[in-house]
Amino acid sequence: MAKEITVLGSTGSIGRQTLEVVAAHPGRFRVAALVAARNDELLAAQVRRFRPRLAVLLDEERARVLAEMVSDPGIRILAGEEGLMAAACLEGVELVVAAMVGIRSLKAILAALEAGKDIALANKEVLVAAGQLVMDRARRLSRQIIPVDSEHSAIFQCLRQGGRVAEVIITASGGPLRQMPRAEMANVTPEQALNHPTWVMGPKITIDSATLMNKGLEVIEAKHLFNLDFDQIKVLIHPQSVVHALVRYSDGALFAQLGPADMRLPIQYALTWPERWDLDVQPLDLAALGHLEFALPDLERFPCLELALQAGRAGGTYPAVLSAADEVAVEYFLAGKITLTAISQVVGRVLDEHQPEPVPDLEGILAADAWARRRAGAVAEGLSF
């Protein structure tokens, strides 16, 4: 029987690649619901191809346009928060792919867990902001959170060995600015920062990769996903992006997961876990690679990583504020309003001004997120050209 899935964020990079994986295995998946923020044309094309029972656009005006484009009585069209929650809880769905950027889908993910769904999680901001809340809910309900990020999928696979974990190592390519002096980074254009050397990703995560903020967010995410102490998680720069993560056990044994830089691999593993299916990808040729490089990150050149590690270690509402402030700062950079180096200035200022809540509930997390967005916008305006 085909596995029914819902895709939250179907028009984004991960959502599109998820549907590529689904299309590569005809008859083995059934797309029950698709959710997008505002891309009505692409969502309409996806709806026509995969024929879900439900299609949702968060933008209510565009949802009306979508209804006219689809015009199929067998497909329900909904909008806004109501539609998002309906898609997350749709009856018969086994797995919800959470691939929307930011924490807008947090309530929907919690509702999906309550409705008995497993989650294939590609949204790191949700676990950064509310990791304890989400993981506690999943454990209480005996539901599975399966990571989609390549690094966390790699850790997930390396942890199948059993035994006490001494250390987890997350790798980073170093991004397009890996060898650029800090003084030159202020002149980097959005086009330069979006030119990632190994991965094809959405714009927000690509900029986070350029600043190494992404790696700091991944450390926080790993802490919650795998119930680790913060100091058990390390970061190494690995330009080839072949080794995605490593796990060192207490006996000194070190397990690594290697593979090509192709997001379809971790996406498919999340969709098919605990099974492993065939996938048409170019095999990794280690002999052709010849060598693999590893180095420690330079926290002075990449202060966003240091800010993320500090916020993660402090806990409480600091990670939620970090994530929200970064999202706003990245939007300003992509719009050409601030420099790349100003991203860390915005995030640092907002973190410094934050009055944390040590053990936040859902309302506390959402309030911290909203405050951080407002404050980051004000700080960014002050730094804008």
Curated annotation (Swiss-Prot):
Gene3D superfamilies membership: 1.10.1740.10, NAD(P)-binding Rossmann-like Domain (3.40.50.720)
Output the GO biological process annotations, alphabetical, semicolon-separated. Answer: isopentenyl diphosphate biosynthetic process, methylerythritol 4-phosphate pathway involved in terpenoid biosynthetic process
UniProt-recorded Gene Ontology molecular function terms: 1-deoxy-D-xylulose-5-phosphate reductoisomerase activity; manganese ion binding; NADPH binding
Keyword NADP assigned to the entry: answer is: yes
| Entry keyword RNA-binding | no
* Function description: Catalyzes the NADPH-dependent rearrangement and reduction of 1-deoxy-D-xylulose-5-phosphate (DXP) to 2-C-methyl-D-erythritol 4-phosphate (MEP).
Task: Report what the protein is called.
Answer: 1-deoxy-D-xylulose 5-phosphate reductoisomerase
Q: Which organism is it from?
A: Moorella thermoacetica (strain ATCC 39073 / JCM 9320)
Please state the gene responsible for encoding this protein: dxr
